[in-house]
A protein has these predicted regions:
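Non-catalytic recognition/regulatory regions in large multidomain proteins
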Residues: 23, 40, 48, 53, ...
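Short loop/turn segments at secondary-structure transitions that flank enzyme active sites
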Residues: 38, 63, 109
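Short, well-ordered strand-loop elements centered on a beta-strand within folded domains, enriched
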Residues: 22-25, 30-31, 64-76, 99-106
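An exposed acidic His-Trp-rich patch
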Residues: 73-133
Length: 184
C-alpha cells in the first residue's frame, strides 16, 4: 500500500523562447498517490508550477505558523513567485498530532470551472511526519538541482529581484531545516 508518494515526472521552463530566460518558476508534471489512490499522474496532462508547489509543500511539513500559509493550495497551476494561483489546483487537509500527520479532504480542480472538481472522499491516511517530510524534501532537492543546472534567470526589475530573493530565501530555509530534522 502506498500511503503517500509524490514525484516530479518532468520539469522545464515555459515553452516560449521569448520567456525561457525570464521564466522564474519551473513547470511540469507530478505523480501523487495518497492512501493508494492516484491523485494525479501523466495521464492528466496538466502542467503545474513545480517550484512554487514545492515551496507550498515545504511549508506544510510542520504545522502552519500563520493562516496565510494554511490557505495556499499544495499543488499550484500558476501564480509565479507570489503563489497566487488560479482555481486549478490539488489540495488536501493536514492534521498534525505528535509525530503523525493525517492527510484527508483531498481534491483536484482541473479547470477554472468550479464544477470541474474531483473529491477523493475515501482518502484518509495517517503517516509519520518523517515519511511525509522526506517525500517533500526529495522533491525540493530536485527543484534545487534543476535551478542550479540552468542558465541564470533574467530578473527584469526590482520587483522580480526582490520576489526571487524572498522565494529562494524561504525555500532554502525550509529545505535546510527539514533536512536537519528529518534526515539525521
Amino acid at each position: 500500500m502506498t500511503a503517500f508518494s509524490i514525484k516530479i515526472l518532468n520539469q522545464n521552463w515555459l515553452k516560449s523562447e521569448d520567456l525561457s530566460n525570464t521564466d522564474l518558476c519551473s513547470h511540469g508534471e507530478f505523480e501523487i498517490i495518497i492512501d493508494n489512490q492516484v491523485i494525479v499522474d501523466k495521464k492528466d496532462e496538466l502542467d503545474w508550477t513545480i517550484s512554487t508547489s514545492v515551496l507550498s509543500l515545504l511549508r506544510s511539513i510542520e504545522p502552519y505558523i500563520n493562516e496565510e500559509e494554511r490557505y495556499c493550495e499544495k499543488i499550484l497551476h500558476c501564480g509565479q513567485l507570489l503563489m497566487l494561483s488560479c482555481p486549478i489546483c490539488i489540495d488536501w487537509d493536514l492534521t498534525y498530532e505528535n509525530d503523525i500527520v493525517t492527510l484527508n479532504n483531498v481534491y483536484k480542480q482541473f479547470s477554472i470551472n468550479s464544477e470541474d472538481v474531483i473529491y477523493f472522499k475515501g482518502v484518509n491516511v495517517k503517516i509519520e511526519i518523517k515519511t511525509y517530510a522526506r517525500e517533500i524534501l526529495k522533491l525540493a532537492e530536485e527543484v534545487k538541482q534543476f535551478f542550479d543546472n540552468q542558465p541564470t534567470r533574467i530578473l527584469c526589475d526590482k520587483w522580480d529581484s526582490s520576489s526571487w530573493d524572498n522565494f529562494w530565501s524561504e525555500f532554502n530555509e525550509l529545505f535546510t531545516r527539514g533536512k536537519d530534522k528529518y534526515f539525521t
